[in-house]
């Protein structure tokens, strides 16, 4: 019984001294990197003339989203969208 306890104690000490705990830290840092990438600032790009859109906010500058129901594209607007 004492031999089993001694072996378990030695294995626990070895796992602590060899850096087994650092694997948790690397997992934590990779989870943090993923969170930052997912929640970080999103770069919004706009669509140019003739590119597909779903609303006026998708189009750049004074372009408006217009077209048939199957294909909406950004077009030059002569009046406000």
Curated annotation (Swiss-Prot):
Coiled-coil blocks: none
Cysteine pairings via disulfide bonds: 46-60, 53-65, 59-74, 64-81
Proregion positions: 20-42
Keyword Nuclease (UniProt): no
Location in the cell: Secreted
Protein family: Belongs to the conotoxin I3 superfamily.
InterPro entries in the cross-refs: Conotoxin
Entry comment describing in which tissues the protein is expressed: Expressed by the venom duct.
GO cellular component labels: extracellular region
UniProt entry keywords in alphabetical sequence: Cleavage on pair of basic residues, Disulfide bond, Secreted, Signal, Toxin
Signal peptide: 1-19
Record protein name field: Conotoxin Pu11.2
Any one Pfam family match given in the protein's UniProt record, by short name: Conotoxin
Source organism of this protein record: Conus pulicarius (Flea-bitten cone)
Gene Ontology MF, one: toxin activity
Secreted listed as a keyword: yes
Domain note: The cysteine framework is XI (C-C-CC-CC-C-C).
């Amino acid at each position: 019984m004492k031999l089993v306890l001694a072996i378990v104690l030695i294995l626990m000490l070895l796992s602590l001294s060899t850096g087994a705990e650092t694997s948790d830290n690397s997992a934590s840092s990779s989870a943090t990197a993923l969170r930052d990438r997912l929640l970080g600032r999103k770069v919004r790009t706009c669509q140019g003339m003739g590119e597909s859109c779903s609303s006026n906010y998708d189009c750049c500058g004074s372009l408006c989203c217009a077209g048939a129901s199957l294909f909406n594209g950004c077009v030059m607007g002569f009046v406000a969208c």
